[in-house]
Design a protein with these regions (language model features):
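Conserved phosphate/ATP/ADP-binding segment of small-molecule kinases
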Residues: 120-193, 226
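Glycine/charged-rich beta-loop-alpha catalytic/anionic-binding loops adjacent to active sites
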Residues: 7-13, 189-200
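Short glycine/threonine-rich catalytic loop with a Thr-x-Gly-x-Asp
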Residues: 196-215
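Conserved N-terminal subdomain of the carbohydrate kinase-like
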Residues: 2-120, 256-259
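Charged C-terminal helix
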Residues: 226-262
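Solvent-exposed, amphipathic alpha-helical segments
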Residues: 210, 214, 218-222, 235-242
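Phosphate-handling active-site elements
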Residues: 37, 191-193, 218-232
Length: 262
C-alpha cells in the first residue's frame, strides 16, 4: 500500500515517550506514512508506558508555550491540529487559545483511562481539563471509559453518549463498544454508525494512537466520516495481524517495521 503525495501540514500535540512506540511518536510515523507534514510539539517527556512502574514525567509546558508562539510568528498554516495527552489545565488553555486564534480544525483524543478506571499519575482535574478542551474540538475520539467520564457517567448506553455530543455539534467516535459477542466502533453521522471488528485477546500499547492517526489521515484525505472509520478499522486489523506475526507478546506495535512493508 502506498500513500498519496499530500504535504499538507498537521500540528500534533501529544506526549513523547523515551521508550516504546506509542504516543506522539507513533502518531507522527503514521501521519508521515500518509504523506502529511507534521509539526510535533510534546506536552510531556515520559520515560515509558503508564503500565510500567516506576515512571518519570517531565512537564514541557514552557516549551509548548514558546513553540506555539514561535509558530504563530512564523505564520504557519495547518490543515488540522490533533491533541492527545495533556498534562494540566494550563496546557489545555494554551492549546485551545491557539486553536481559537487560528480557527483550527481540532481532533481530540481525551486520554484519561480505560477499563472503567482513570490512569494513575494523571492530574486530579483531568476530566474537567478534557471537558474544557472538548468544547473546542470538532471530532472527539475516546474509548468507552473516557466517553463516560466526559459525560459524568450520566448515560448508561453508549448510543446516548454519541447522541448527546451530536446534539451539541460534535462528531464523536467511541473506539470500542462491546455488546454480547459483538465488538464495534460507534459513531453517528445523522444515523448511527456501528462498524464491527474482530476482537483480539491481546493488548498492544499505542492502539489508541494508531486509531487516531489513521482516522485523521483518512478523514482529511477524503472528508468522508463513515469511509474514514471503515478504512481505519481495516488498516488497524492489517497492522495488528502483522504485529502478531512479528511478536504477539510485545508491549507495543512495531509501527516503523510494519509501515515499511505496507
Amino acid at each position: 500500500m502506498k500513500s498519496c503525495k499530500n504535504n499538507e501540514k498537521i500540528l500534533l500535540i501529544n506526549d513523547f515517550l523515551s521508550s516504546g512506540n506509542i504516543g506522539g511518536s507513533l502518531c507522527k510515523s503514521v501521519l508521515n506514512f500518509y504523506s502529511f507534514d507534521i509539526d510535533f510539539v510534546p506536552t510531556a517527556l515520559i520515560s515509558n508506558m503508564f503500565s510500567l512502574k516506576p515512571i518519570e514525567i517531565f512537564d514541557s509546558s514552557d516549551f509548548l508555550t514558546n513553540t506555539l508562539e514561535v509558530y504563530k510568528k512564523q505564520n504557519r498554516k495547518y490543515k488540522a491540529i490533533f491533541v492527545g495527552f495533556v498534562l494540566n489545565f494550563n496546557q489545555a488553555k494554551i492549546i485551545c487559545d491557539f486553536v481559537k486564534e487560528n480557527n483550527l480544525f481540532m481532533v481530540l483524543d481525551p486520554i484519561m483511562g480505560d477499563s472503567g478506571k482513570i490512569y494513575s499519575g494523571l492530574d486530579k482535574n483531568i476530566v474537567e481539563i478534557y471537558k474544557y478542551m472538548a468544547d473546542y474540538a470538532h471530532i472527539i475520539i475516546p474509548n468507552l471509559t473516557e466517553a463516560r467520564l466526559l459525560t459524568d457517567n450520566k448515560f448508561k448506553k453508549a448510543h446516548d453518549i454519541v447522541d448527546y455530543f451530536e446534539n451539541i455539534g460534535k462528531k464523536f467516535i467511541i473506539t470500542s463498544v462491546e455488546d454480547g459477542n459483538r465488538h464495534f466502533i460507534l459513531a453517528k453521522d445523522k444515523y448511527f454508525i456501528e462498524e464491527d471488528y474482530k476482537f483480539l485477546d491481546k493488548s498492544f500499547g499505542g492502539s489508541g494512537d494508531l486509531f487516531d492517526s489513521i482516522f485523521l489521515a483518512n478523514y482529511l484525505k477524503n472528508n468522508d466520516f463513515l469511509l474514514a472509520i471503515k478504512n481505519t478499522r481495516d488498516m488497524i486489523a492489517c497492522i495488528l495481524d502483522m504485529q502478531i506475526k512479528i511478536d504477539d507478546k510485545a508491549n507495543d506495535i512495531s509501527i516503523n517495521e510494519i509501515l515499511k512493508k505496507l
